[in-house]
Amino acid sequence: MKKMKKVLIALFVITTLSVTAQESVLLRLNYTKGDSFLVTTESNQSMGSQGGMNMKMTMGMIVADVAEENIKTESQITSIVMDMMQGGMTMNYDSNKSDEELDQMGQMLKSQFAPMMEAIIYNTLDYQGNMIDTKLDPAIPGMEQITNRSMNAINYPKEKVSVGSSWSSEDENQGMKMTTKYTVSSIADGLVTLDVSGDMNMSGAAGTGTIKGKTTIDISTGISNNSEIEMTIATQGMNITGTTKITVSKM
């Protein structure tokens, strides 16, 4: 009986050590030239009595080049569907509809969105997911912020991570500074799941906010293939809440 107990304890220790070894992974982008992906972003925002917005956007991304130090991608928005209510007015837009199917407000929104859908977004990233350069052709002011968020990019740490590991990144764009913390909550079946939390601060004390959620990373490719983030923002006497879901699938 004692011998059997010792054997069971030994097996338990070996199994535990084996699992621990498997749970230490190095997160890196692992693209191949010619890879193509479909990025789907679904977001909704509520401003209480002020209104709100629901939007679904799809974007195609192609890996144009894979070099020793960086990766170059080319992306283009393929569809936008939006419903917005503001000041008692409802506005709808669907890029899949013809001009005849759009109402007057929809046609006005098309004049704003159509140039975005024609633009090509050129991104250069390093293997840790840091954005080195972003260019748009033709250039459209403000579009970089939309596309960078939609790509669901995460800056990976230099060292390997295991369950409980955490790291932070900072980003500033158009007067908004965002600090995001990532914590590894599980590693299983070739996936790393991260708990996401963070704070937002707008310049000039215009507002503050928080974010929280989860994202899942495919270890083999380094792609954040599924993400769901909740946010709250307090600005100019308004409380804004919203959620953003992003899925990335290989085509």
Model-derived features: where do they sit?
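Mixed-charge, low-complexity intrinsically disordered segments
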Residues: Q76, V81-M117
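Solvent-exposed helix/loop surface patches that form functional interfaces
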Residues: S111-L191
